[in-house]
Amino acid sequence: MTRFVIIGGGPAGNTAATTAARLGAQVTMIEREVIGGAAHLWDCIPSKSMIATGRAISRTRAIGGMGLETVDTSVDVETLTQRIEWVKDTMRDNTTSLLQSQGVRLIRGSGRFTDPNTVVV
């Protein structure tokens, strides 16, 4: 029998699930989209990756004032996109593996309460 049902596999849900499981609870997580959190994986990681790339270009251009020869730097959008996808996939896979290693049962779908003690998917 599941003692804890967590609806949503974002950062808060993942923390709650692993904490409860480590304390010995039987935990079920219901996620309709992606483990790791849609906003986290679709907004934060891509934007932070693009910001980091922009900063690297800025630093590369600034080294000319340090007596170093510079080359014109540009963004390879395909490579940047591949890196973003790799980071997202790695984070999602690592989070899923962590949940499974803690014995958290994962269910794909949308969960909702039908009464204070019942969740349907």
Question: What are the residue ranges of the model-derived segments?
Answer:
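Beta1/beta-strand and adjacent pyrophosphate-binding region of the FAD-binding site
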Residues: M1-A12
